[in-house]
Regions:
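"A position-specific structural signal for the A-helix of alpha-solenoid helical repeats
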Residues: 51-52, 84, 90-91, 95, ...
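Structural motif corresponding to the intra-repeat A-B loop/turn of tetratricopeptide repeats
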Residues: 59-60, 99, 149, 187, ...
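Amphipathic alpha-helical segments of tetratricopeptide repeats
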Residues: 70-77, 110-124, 157-172, 201-211
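Residue signature of alpha-solenoid helical repeat architecture, marking inter-repeat boundaries
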Residues: 43-44, 80-85, 126-135, 174-178
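DNA major-groove recognition helix of helix-turn-helix/homeodomain DNA-binding modules
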Residues: 19-34
């Protein structure tokens, strides 16, 4: 959020909704699931829609039903509700990935990052930038799909960027658990294929850090 908006939150002139509060906590390295919030009816409905989408996508693996649920969710979201639009684009990109349409998925992920004015350039050039879990996932998935699509050099640019970001922000260790070992593994593969065996080994021995 902007400095002005943050000032209003701090002075109780404005109250962030649940999803914005989640994003702010994630940027600070905290897990929103460890905190309790009083949600409005609209926020509760959005939460239920997300739960339905997650179940359809990951448990039932019903792509068509998931796509329809996303369309219903999207109808309720206003243009200014950027965090919700970002979430919808993330899931749309994941569906495209399931269909092996990796280039299309990457384009959708890049659109999603723009919802919060986040980009590979911003993250690479700003050492003090704080990422939400969704932004971290989007950047990781861009790298992953680039790698699968054979664009390994471009993929490693994203993986190195995220590795540096995670190591500079130890407060956000919850974000490491899913992505950090995968990032090290992909980077180790890239170094091995470039005949940099020492660098590859150095990455491999840290794939399961003791502090994760």
């Amino acid at each position: 959020c902007t400095v002005m908006a943050l000032s209003r939150y701090e002075s109780d002139e404005r109250i962030p909704d649940k999803f914005l509060m989640d994003a702010l906590l994630e940027r600070l390295g905290f897990q929103p699931s460890k905190y309790e919030f009083v949600a409005s009816d609209q926020e509760f409905e959005y939460s239920m829609k997300r739960a339905q989408i997650e179940k359809l996508l990951y448990e039932k693996r019903d792509v068509q039903a998931c796509r329809e649920a996303l369309q219903e969710y999207e109808k309720q979201v206003q243009e200014k509700e950027r965090l919700h639009r970002q979430y919808i684009l993330l899931k749309k990109g994941l569906i495209l990935g399931r269909e092996e349409k990796y280039s299309d998925a990457i384009n959708v992920f890049e659109q999603a990052l723009k919802c919060t004015e986040c980009s590979e350039t911003n993250v690479a050039n700003q050492t003090d930038i704080l990422l939400t879990n969704t932004e971290t996932e989007l950047l990781y998935l861009i790298g992953k799909f680039l790698y699968i699509d054979g664009k390994k050099k471009d993929a490693c640019t994203y993986f190195r960027m995220l590795k540096n970001q995670m190591e500079q922000r130890p407060a956000g260790k919850e974000k490491w658990k899913e992505y950090y070992p995968c990032i090290l593994y992909r980077l180790a593969q890239c170094e091995f294929e470039a005949y940099n065996y020492g660098a590859s080994y150095a990455l491999q021995i840290h794939i399961v850090p003791s502090d994760i």
